[in-house]
Regions:
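Membrane-interface transmembrane helices that cradle and orient dolichyl/undecaprenyl
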Residues: 9, 75, 82-101, 109, ...
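Membrane-interface alpha helices of multi-pass inner-membrane proteins
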Residues: 11-12, 38, 51-56, 81, ...
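Transmembrane-helix motifs of polytopic, lipid-linked glycan transferases
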Residues: 19-43, 81-85
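Hydrophobic, aromatic-rich transmembrane alpha-helices
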Residues: 30-35, 125-129, 134-135, 224-263
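Transmembrane-helix signature of polytopic, membrane-embedded enzymes
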Residues: 35-59, 77-78, 91-101, 260-267
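Hydrophobic/aromatic-rich transmembrane helices and adjacent perimembrane loops
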Residues: 72-75, 109-112, 118-119, 171, ...
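Membrane-embedded, lumen/periplasm-facing catalytic core of multi-pass transferases
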Residues: 87, 313-389
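Signature aromatic-anchored transmembrane alpha helix within multi-pass, membrane-resident enzymes
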Residues: 104, 121-125, 148-156, 265-266, ...
């Protein structure tokens, strides 16, 4: 359902290093470097370096942006940093390299978070337009043409590629994957002025629960309490980027709002606030194009805090040093949490905070089971049976890009006919049943899988058979079944 930026990063990691996570790690490193580069255009170099360091501590080491396969946050933050870092440089020194970096950043936003990227590009376009048409120091027409030709060509090339991508995937160059997903599954609208759609026919209960109980519930909360929900969204976003440790500089917010140095960044965040207020949902990566702007304003607040004096004493300097020290201590605590046997708060007690110190517990048990299955001889098919109250956010069913050639394939359990079709399609595989909500999680042979294959081969057009009568006669499908069934 997501735009192709994430897939490109994962594919690059897989092709170049053999593991997709290294693509995520590389983009996260580039993101932190780009944030530092952007800050150098707005703040003194020493403060820009501090900002890059804080970005590494807060979101570059432990957050869900680097410790998950959902990479849109890092990609869009990288793109936003390139855009906001190129704008002041381009105005001071109209050079092709800055124009290309701006176009590259806008392209990264388009393939990762296009809506929020548009919110960022609107004030950027307005500022550049004002510079080109209303300022006396604008470049000559010929120089402007040479300056803009290559960036415009880059943007048009990227747009054409995205149109081709959508056409090959969905039959229309103007139908992005996100639209297809929302029209197929979602009932809750995306913006506050829209109405819910009729409930579609879901093949799996867990899908219905996600779109009905999670998304539709969020829409209802917005309708009955717009202001408190908007304030909660704002607080959640601030806490993700700053945490408690970086909140003291916000005491200087009244001075930052009057600061000419960062006035344009304030306008950018005001546009973001308006765009997020009318949007139903918010997750940390929705704000990612504005990551560098967040840190720029936070650092400018720290600069004002540093100058604060009380009774002639520089108390602000102590506050700034204490803030940075707390960030360092928290980073060290998170790094050595396991050897120190520290209990880290987990979902759902700390949903938003866990996004910076993650990973959350989701996925750990699946990774253990997947590693066990990968060691078995032959190919495996895993059928996952969820309980009625399974958390829809704890998903076990996802696969590698080339599903049919994968060592292990994961699928949700369906009705008898669909299960038979699945098992017959992968008849050469060992078939297992996993119930993620049982403790301990066990991997056992799928009931009657061998009888299902035999019955399907004899009568493929009659799937509704009483397969469970032969369950007692089934033998393990491999010698590894017994120890798997006893796995803790």
């Amino acid at each position: 359902m997501y735009f192709p930026g994430e897939g490109l990063v994962l594919a690059a990691g897989k092709v170049l290093t053999g593991h997709p996570w290294y693509g995520i790690l590389s983009v996260s490193a580039l993101m932190c470097a780009a944030i530092c580069w952007m800050l150098q255009a707005w703040l003194p170099p020493s403060w820009a370096l501090l900002g890059g360091f804080l970005a590494v501590l807060r979101i570059g080491l432990f957050s869900c942006w680097v410790n998950s396969y959902h990479t849109a946050g890092s990609i869009a933050a990288l793109g936003g940093a390139l855009v906001l870092g190129a704008v002041p440089r381009l105005r001071k020194h109209p050079q092709l390299r800055y124009a290309m970096l701006l176009a590259l950043g806008a392209g990264l936003l388009a393939i990762s978070r296009p809506y929020e990227g548009l919110l960022l590009c609107l004030p950027v376009a307005a500022a550049l337009g004002h510079w080109l048409w209303a300022r006396k120091n604008r470049p000559p027409a010929g120089a402007l043409l040479r300056l803009s030709a290559a960036p415009v060509a880059l943007i048009f090339t990227l747009g054409a590629w995205m149109g081709y991508y959508d056409y090959r995937a969905f039959g229309s160059p103007f139908t992005p994957p996100y639209v297809v997903d929302r029209e197929t599954y979602a009932t809750a609208p995306y913006f506050v002025w829209q109405s819910p759609r009729p409930e579609p026919a879901y093949r799996h209960v867990v899908m219905r629960r996600f779109y009905e109980e999670n998304e539709l519930a969020a829409w209802k909360r917005i309708q009955t309490g717009f202001l408190p929900q908007t304030l909660m969204k704002a607080a959640a976003g601030i806490l993700f980027f700053s945490g408690i440790a970086l909140l003291p500089p916000l005491l200087m917010l009244h001075r930052v709002l009057r600061d000419r140095r960062v006035r344009f960044l304030i306008v950018c965040l005001a546009v973001l606030s308006a765009g997020m207020a009318v949007q139903i949902f918010i997750v940390a990566h929705y704000l990612s194009p504005f990551t560098a702007a967040f840190y720029a304003l936070g650092l400018q607040a720290m600069r004002h805090l540093r100058l604060m004096r009380f009774d002639g004493r520089p108390v602000g300097l102590g506050w700034v040093r204490l803030t940075v020290t707390i960030c360092l201590v928290l980073g060290g605590v998170r790094l050595f949490a396991s050897p120190l046997h520290l209990q880290i708060p987990q979902w759902p007690a700390s949903e938003w905070n866990s996004q910076w110190y993650g990973p959350i517990e989701f996925g750990k048990e699946r990774a253990r089971v997947a590693a066990t299955l990968e060691r078995l001889p032959g190919k495996q098919l895993v059928i996952v049976r969820y309980s009625a109250d399974h958390n829809p956010l704890d998903e076990w069913v996802y696969n590698a890009p080339d599903i049919d050639r994968s060592k292990v394939i994961w699928a949700r359990e369906m009705d008898a006919a669909d299960n038979l079709e699945l098992i017959l399609y992968y008849r050469e595989r060992n078939v297992w049943l996993i119930e993620p909500d049982t403790r301990p999680v066990e991997v056992v042979p799928y009931p009657d899988s061998r009888a299902l294959k035999c019955a399907g081969q004899k009568s493929p057009s009659t799937p509704a058979l009483n397969y469970h009568a032969n369950r007692a006669a089934l033998a393990p499908t491999s010698a590894a079944v017994a120890p798997l069934a006893q796995a803790p």
